[in-house]
Amino acid sequence: MYIHYLKDLIGFKSVTPENDGAIEYIDDLLKQHGFKTEIKIFGDFKSEQVTNLYAIFGRNEPNICFVGHVDVVPVDNHALWHNSSPFKASKQDGKIYGRGAVDMKGAIACFLAASLDFIKNNAGFKGSISFLLTSDEEGKAKHGTKEMLQYIYDQGYKVDFAIVGEPTCEKEIGDTIKIGRRGSVNFKLNIDGLAGHVAYPHKANNPLPCLIKILHELTNIRLDEGTEFFQNSNLEVTNIDVGNETSNVIPASTEASFNIRFNNLHSAETLAKQVEEIIKRYCKEYKVDYKLEYSSFAGSFIQNPSAKIKEFAKVVEHTLKIKPKFSTSGGTSDARFVKNYCPLVEFGLLSETAHKINEYTKISDLQKLYDVYYNFLIKIL
């Protein structure tokens, strides 16, 4: 059934933060199989409103919760996709193509199939199975998982262990389980000099040489050497803007943006202090003024492998005959919200084609993921 569910889910044009009926489809399916469900819409303005779902079967402990998102990233060029339609699932050569196939409608489809089969085959099992789904993960992630978790806890629900279905595997299904994530901090730097004619540089103060020096040092600095589970922290320049359309004018100001993905040796605040010390030094040397702004929507985190995390890893190894590694690589995810409530693993399909043209998953990989999810429910419940 996971192929059927995935094809249906791909058919919803749920470009973040839109839901396009995907949540309602899952809600209806789970209701038909005895789940208690509730859809909540959060967001003050219509343009910000996000659709969320919590569904649970049973009320006993432990509550195993699948956390995921139905929203997908936008598609730029439909013509380059199979059948010219990223929102119409295409089955070719043992693969399912479509936007969201791996990130992360495929994992949702697998856990839907695994949980419904488990309930059918194991009447009277101990514990509970639940879903927490949102349409706001690929975007601002403001009114999705974060708010929904708080809401269900206010209603008296408690999650004992969560599986976040992000595409975590690298080369084959089962090779990677994520137990943490790097943090992310964005910087915007404005430097003000003095405009003038390029023929009279002594009557101006060009802010660009200062910016070049700053960015050169920032991009060459070694922030750390990494840790056991984290790669080294990394800074990337994402934008430089002068706003100068002519070649004979020294600009009055310049702006640069950069991002740091950091491990648990840092915080956004300590990095901002380190960055500003470098900026301040060069701006003083070049006699220019600056303004530095930074914002962080995600700090780094790492979990000590709990009993259930280790149990999940054993199920992966037993099911797929591959020993998974614990990792924290990649971008941010909603796991950063879930970890405040319960232990978790992030485990899903291969990440190779996520967000790409002709995103796809192998049907054989869907079967492997289904098997892991089903066998974990058997083991724990």
Curated annotation (Swiss-Prot):
Reactions the enzyme catalyzes: N-succinyl-(2S,6S)-2,6-diaminopimelate + H2O = (2S,6S)-2,6-diaminopimelate + succinate
Residues the record lists as binding Zn(2+) 1: H69, D103, E166
EC number: 3.5.1.18
Record-linked InterPro entries: ArgE/DapE_CS, Bact_exopeptidase_dim_dom, DapE_proteobac, Peptidase_M20, Peptidase_M20_dimer, Peptidase_M20A
A Pfam family that the UniProt record links to this protein: Peptidase_M20
Keywords from the UniProt entry: Amino-acid biosynthesis, Cobalt, Diaminopimelate biosynthesis, Hydrolase, Lysine biosynthesis, Metal-binding, Zinc
GO molecular function, one term: cobalt ion binding
Cofactor note as given: Binds 2 Zn(2+) or Co(2+) ions per subunit.
Record pathway: Amino-acid biosynthesis; L-lysine biosynthesis via DAP pathway; LL-2,6-diaminopimelate from (S)-tetrahydrodipicolinate (succinylase route): step 3/3
Entry binding sites for Zn(2+) 2: D103, E138, H355
Keyword Amino-acid biosynthesis part of the UniProt annotation: yes
Essential cofactor(s): Zn(2+); Co(2+)
Gene3D superfamilies documented for this protein: 3.30.70.360, Zn peptidases (3.40.630.10)
Record GO biological process: diaminopimelate biosynthetic process; L-arginine biosynthetic process; lysine biosynthetic process via diaminopimelate
Domain of life: Bacteria
Role, per record: Catalyzes the hydrolysis of N-succinyl-L,L-diaminopimelic acid (SDAP), forming succinate and LL-2,6-diaminopimelate (DAP), an intermediate involved in the bacterial biosynthesis of lysine and meso-diaminopimelic acid, an essential component of bacterial cell walls.
Subunit structure: Homodimer.
Family according to the record: Belongs to the peptidase M20A family. DapE subfamily.
Protein name, UniProt field: Succinyl-diaminopimelate desuccinylase
UniProt organism field: Rickettsia akari (strain Hartford)
Gene: dapE
